[in-house]
Amino acid sequence: MTATPKPLVLIILDGFGHSESHKGNAILAAKMPVMDRLYQTMPNGLISGSGMDVGLPDGQMGNSEVGHMNLGAGRVVYQDFTRVTKAIRDGEFFENPTICAAVDKAVSAGKAVHIMGLLSDGGVHSHQDHLVAMAELAVKRGAEKIYLHAFLDGRDTPPRSAKKSLELMDATFARLGKGRTATIVGRYFAMDRDNRWDRVSSAYNLIVDSTADFHADSAVAGLEAAYARDENDEFVKATRIGEAARVEDGDAVVFMNFRADRARELTRVFVEDDFKDFERARQPKVNYVMLTQYAASIPAPSAFAAGSLKNVLGEYLADNGKTQLRIAETEKYAHVTFFFSGGREEPFPGEERILIPSPKVATYDLQPEMSAPEVTDKIVDAIEHQRYDVIVVNYANGDMVGHSGIMEAAIKAVECLDVCVGRIAEALEKVGGEALITADHGNVEQMTDDSTGQAHTAHTSEPVPFVYVGKRQLKVRQGGVLADVAPTMLHLLGMEKPQEMTGHSILVAE
């Protein structure tokens, strides 16, 4: 290791895809002189961040968890979405020992099976087909009382698209002859990840005690009433459907989200005896199952155990005596640490982490710069003092403001990013450092939905930029994917890649 590291900085612009279309494209509408200059003067190209290229089903848009897993692993990582879907197709899901044990315990005691999760075809945190399969499993194993607690999307799907998903579940329960939708609530409340416990408590109290300001005879009627209150899917307030279906001691509760970050908080409320972030009216003693492991510290079993990834970038750098910094604001901190490290919570030796709090605003269109300037201050300081060999940073703006669907805010967000990238590039030039700029998936390059005319709030399957910033004479090869980024970094560091990394350097000599 050199005495004064000249850092290699990986800049991940979250949700910053590439599209030639100008319609609803915040990136092309924005003034971005720094990125324009880098595209003209530095080696750059496009790489894939979606579908089979990142271990998702063909055509499936990428997301932040998947993107960071692939970026850090240096290999295509077979995703939980694909694992669960395959298990359902193969029939293994219906024999899953963890789920079956919880359901069988409830059934033998004459208790209910509660299925909860994000009900949509977005495929980012969950998929509605998985919830259908869970209802089928419960019926096959003899459950008489089956209740669905549906979290509505409108973020990874169009803002008002939940009706068809609710109708799918109604049709499923009718076909099975058992089960019904018991509650609906927007993901804004049920799937927080920033310790906004007032939101989480409204979802928990709805599910456990049927406590709700709104009631409806059917899920679709409840949804239509929410639309009449001007609440899009994501923001639908707690609504009880039909008779109360309280969660009781001995019931089974299966959380069908496969993505961890937005499933942890609600899970903790259910299973932690010493939970103190808000006062629970009740904590029923249930047979709780997480579809995947949301965190190693959560005292509940998971149906699909986490697979371990060996020799991810962070581990390999540590084993070779390199120092590294991971930095992001709250919204993406888990991605640049836990997910980038292949599902590992603890830092590697020589790894430091900086968490910058995200602004406490209801939605990020109200503060589109988010905490990017503060993140950049810390990075520039680290570069100037040459403290680390490698710095990995995530800028949340493109994704989080992109999800708002508000074009003006998205333009401000990416213009802020341009300034931040410029500051990093300037600091690196002074010390002889290098950077790679890329993204985990698309979003902010498509802010309007061509087919519906509504705001487009979901991710896209567009390719993402890849830019080398430095003095070497290199060119970008075609056909790169996110899994090629870690091997590219090792190439720049003059290190052989470990055999577990199947990706290949995107940069080649001119």
From Swiss-Prot:
The active site is at residue 64. One of its GO terms (molecular function) is manganese ion binding. One of its GO terms (cellular component) is cytosol. One of its GO terms (biological process) is glycolytic process. Its EC number is 5.4.2.12. Keywords: Glycolysis, Isomerase, Manganese, Metal-binding. It is an enzyme of class 5 (isomerase). Mn(2+) 1 binds at residues 399, 403, 459. Substrate binds at residues 125, 155-156, 187, 193, 259-262, 332. Its cofactor is Mn(2+). Pathway: Carbohydrate degradation; glycolysis; pyruvate from D-glyceraldehyde 3-phosphate: step 3/5. Binds 2 manganese ions per subunit. It catalyses: (2R)-2-phosphoglycerate = (2R)-3-phosphoglycerate. Mn(2+) 2 binds at residues 14, 64, 440-441. PANTHER family: 2,3-BISPHOSPHOGLYCERATE-INDEPENDENT PHOSPHOGLYCERATE MUTASE. Monomer. Catalyzes the interconversion of 2-phosphoglycerate and 3-phosphoglycerate. Belongs to the BPG-independent phosphoglycerate mutase family. HAMAP family: GpmI. This is 2,3-bisphosphoglycerate-independent phosphoglycerate mutase. It comes from Pseudomonas syringae pv. syringae (strain B728a). The gene is gpmI.
